Amino acid sequence: YDRHNGKVINQITKGQWYVREVLHVDEEQRVIYFSANGMVPNEDPYLLRYYRIHFDGSGLTCLTPEEGMHQATFSADRKYFVDVYSLAHKAPVAILKEAEQGKVVMPLETANISELTKAGWRAPEVFCAKGRDGQTDMWGIIVRPTNFDPNKKYPVIEYIYAGPGSHYTPKSFLAYN
């Protein structure tokens, strides 16, 4: 938008996905850094990723292409960022990346969950089912007890919020699932 008259200069992004947050506007390089979700087909649309794009809408670049829920922390000069990502059923990974193209500078850490597994922790089961319309994907997880017996019956807690643009199903790794 033109800040003086409020008119649209050009649309920067478009598509069937959501810009969640504008993280930084680099006026000198004419680039915007932002987080978004819903851009990867056949993937849970609530998984957050980070992107950069030029003011004119060209050069859209995914900085965090690895499958997962991402959390990026940028350096003060915005040349690098630490990307920590995971899924409800996959342990966190931390990597250092450069911010221009998202290239990996170096891996930092991968969580070791062997002690959790030894203690009986079971990863949640991620699933996708069709909604009532037969077309809409509904993503969720099944969390089973550590001492799960498939021959027993268990109570089920179904926690659902069917509103737009929000989710309450854990998307990232939580050791207490």
What would you call each of these model-derived segments?
Residues 19-24, 69-73:
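Repeated scaffold domains used in trafficking and secretory/extracellular systems
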Residues 26-35:
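Repeat-blade elements of multi-bladed beta-propeller folds
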Residues 8-13, 59-64:
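A short beta-strand motif characteristic of beta-propeller blades
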Residues 6-9, 22-24:
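Long, ordered, helix-rich scaffold segments
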Residues 3-6, 54-58, 99-101:
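Short loop/turn segments that connect beta-strands within beta-propeller blades
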Residues 1, 13-20, 36-49, 65-67, ...:
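A flexible loop/linker signature enriched in serine peptidases of the S9 family
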Residues 29, 62-64, 69-177:
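Serine-hydrolase catalytic core recognition
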